[in-house]
């Protein structure tokens, strides 16, 4: 059990609702959101645009007033406290650095507003700029820094007065792909060294999985699932979560047989799942939707390989760490595309070739057939 799992609850949100009312209509942005954030953890709100993650963050910061519900911070009702009394640091999508000020002055600005002594301001600014690794930039203006450096200065400004809570609203959205990877690692390092409880908002699944202690997946103003990155990825609670987090294949089937379950597909093919640790046994003699990740499948160049699904290679993509195969199979005479990830190219298999797809189903999971509707609404 990690230190965060043992930690006390820093922030508690209960039954939070937010309705934006217009002259002719209203929009419910948050619908009964409840969260507990532990001391020192990096907690991510993850979801597509319009799911309510930024509205949740703005309610925590005090920029939006909830329509109902309660926000407790360190055991104190925080719901109606104005933003300037919440001791919260925040980094926005646009870093909001003052262009006419030096880096030192940007970071020191909040401390001067708080009327700290000159000596204490210098000590704090020097310490935090060293933490973010930009000691040599103190006299420069923001326009003289790269995007990644500006992001770190915005982070330093949010941390310099030792906030009890740090809020990050899609802070990497303006950076290129390679810099995003570097900066998410830097944010994690800085957050851990500062030991500050942090709530991070993003729509980027890879970003959330790589830096978070826990993740709340949101959809349509509700929390769909809360868990560690591996729990969210490996054991999603619904088809919607499974489809949103990473790549996934969904295949309609029926579970038959005793002992090792036999999955019967609409293509009239069957595969046997051995040593299953998933929930397949609970679907005995019932229909379900098989959920399997691309890396849990394997391609054989022998189209007659036993215990497999037959298909045809449509596209082969080299992605660096993996080779992704787009395979067309048939269910009820209807074509369906599935993804299969391999460590390297399968020898002798090219676009247009017939192949067999093996399912390593030890961790495969079934969802109720009625959840198939969620795929059309993600």
Regions found by a protein language model. Give the residues of each.
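Pre-Walker A (P-loop) beta-loop-beta motif of ABC nucleotide-binding domains
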Residues: 33-44, 98
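Non-catalytic connector elements of ABC transporters
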Residues: 248, 258-378
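ABC ATPase nucleotide-binding domains
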Residues: 81-89, 93-243
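Helix-to-loop junction immediately C-terminal to a conserved catalytic motif
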Residues: 61
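Conserved ABC transporter NBD signature motif
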Residues: 69-77
